[in-house]
Regions:
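Inter-helical junctions in multi-pass inner-membrane proteins, predominant
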Residues: 1-12, 136, 157-162, 188-234, ...
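Transmembrane helix-bundle core of multi-pass membrane transporters
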Residues: 85, 90-160, 187, 252, ...
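Membrane-embedded helix boundary and interhelical linker motif in transport proteins
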Residues: 4, 26-76, 80, 210-211, ...
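Membrane-interfacial amphipathic/re-entrant helices at transmembrane-helix boundaries
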Residues: 1-15, 44, 55-62, 88-93, ...
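Pore- or pathway-lining transmembrane helices of multi-pass membrane proteins that form conduits
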Residues: 36-40, 85-109, 217-229, 257-276, ...
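Helix-loop-helix "hairpin" substructures at the membrane interface of multi-pass membrane proteins
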Residues: 10, 135-212, 236-241, 305-309
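Cytosolic-side transmembrane-helix boundaries in multi-pass membrane proteins
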Residues: 111, 115, 172-179, 183-186, ...
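Alpha-helical transmembrane segments within multi-pass membrane transporters and channels
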Residues: 20, 54-100, 107, 241-246, ...
Length: 341
């Protein structure tokens, strides 16, 4: 049951991380405002759902329309702000996207107020299916199916269309794409639209499970960055696998201690960065985009004894959360987790 719950929670995380990975792969901008698109998707889906009524068609129409509206907002952000700073230092780009976060926060507070919004139930998916002694919400099953559909749609989009070919080419060499006569500005804008739509869709479909509040952007962006790094920059399939991994860690880790999920998430990222700096499905040549700078080589584990030692250490670290409740008292456990966080 916890496994299926983890898959359901990974659905929206995958959509957000996929959009973030696509945007970074082409524009090379670490979009700190991507979590704001996720938050806007939830709030817009709430308002549109109120207007369209409580039918199944109205609910899913609100979800799709909210995602498209977030995509248009992403286009405005790209055209008015980010297009002017593509050649700026990374620190300036990060500060600019953080400014967008503050603007969206204030706009959301002004439009919807400070109160948390309770998400509506998805019509037709408001019951649960019994699996053994437990019950799994039908909406969780819908999220699992939706994430697979989104993954397939993205694969077809990037592998079977000319636009997808151009995007993959721009991910490898933007200058060569420009030399071939491709309008880079509008290619970047279209990529930003797709990435923002994915983030908005992730927020909209998560609304029935968690509602909407002003902390959604900050709560999702850290996990999304971890998923992108673990999966590999620019890899959609890697983002999917990493989202599933993080979702399962959260689902099982919460059984031990709720806050330990954050520790497990960054522990996995640290291990991946040490052994495979470019991510699970990333490529070494994508690990850096600075001319003349070589991608970092992974840690070389010489000999089978060293490899076995690292494996034992990794397994011990992963098993530590399950062993600590029996090894130390609750107060010491809470204190240790707070220190790690």
């Amino acid at each position: 049951m916890q496994f299926l719950t983890g898959l359901a929670s990974a659905a929206s995380l995958f959509m957000v991380a996929a959009g973030l990975s696509i945007i970074f792969g082409v524009s090379r901008i670490v979009n700190f405002a991507h979590g704001s698109f996720y938050m806007l998707g939830a709030y817009l889906a709430y308002s549109l759902g109120q207007r369209f009524g409580g039918s199944g068609l109205g609910f899913w129409s609100a979800v799709v329309l909210a995602a498209l509206l977030v995509g248009l907002i992403g286009v405005l952000v790209e055209v008015l702000i980010l297009r002017r700073i593509y050649q700026a230092p990374e620190l300036f780009q990060l500060l600019a996207t953080f400014g967008v976060v503050l603007i969206v926060q204030d706009a959301t507070l002004w439009l919807w107020g400070p109160e948390d919004l309770i998400g509506p139930r998805a019509p037709g998916l408001d019951s649960a299916i019994r699996i053994g002694q437990d019950y799994l919400p039908e909406y969780d099953i819908a999220l699992i199916v939706l994430s697979a559909v989104v993954l397939l749609a993205l694969w077809l989009l990037f592998r079977k269309t000319r636009w997808g070919t151009l995007v993959r080419a721009a991910t490898q060499d933007r200058e060569m794409v420009a030399a071939l006569g491709v309008n880079q500005a509008w290619l970047f804008t279209s990529v930003f639209f797709v990435g923002a739509v994915l983030a908005g869709l992730g927020g909209a479909v998560q609304l029935p499970k968690g509602g909407a509040d002003l902390l959604l952007d900050m709560n999702i962006i850290a996990a999304a960055f971890v998923v992108v790094v673990v999966g590999g920059m620019g890899s959609i399939t890697g983002a999917f696998l990493a989202a599933v991994l993080i979702g399962e860690l959260n689902a099982f880790g919460v059984l031990i201690f709720p806050q330990i999920t954050l520790v497990l998430m960054f522990l996995v990222m640290a291990v991946v960065l040490v052994i495979r700096p470019w991510g699970l499905l990333g490529r070494p040549e994508d690990a850096t985009h600075t001319p003349g700078v070589q991608a970092q080589e992974p840690l070389r584990l010489a000999g089978w004894k060293a490899q076995a030692g690292w494996l034992v250490l990794l397994l011990g670290l992963l098993a530590l959360p399950w062993l600590t409740p029996w090894l130390i008292d609750e107060f010491t456990l809470v204190l240790a987790i707070e220190i790690l966080i």
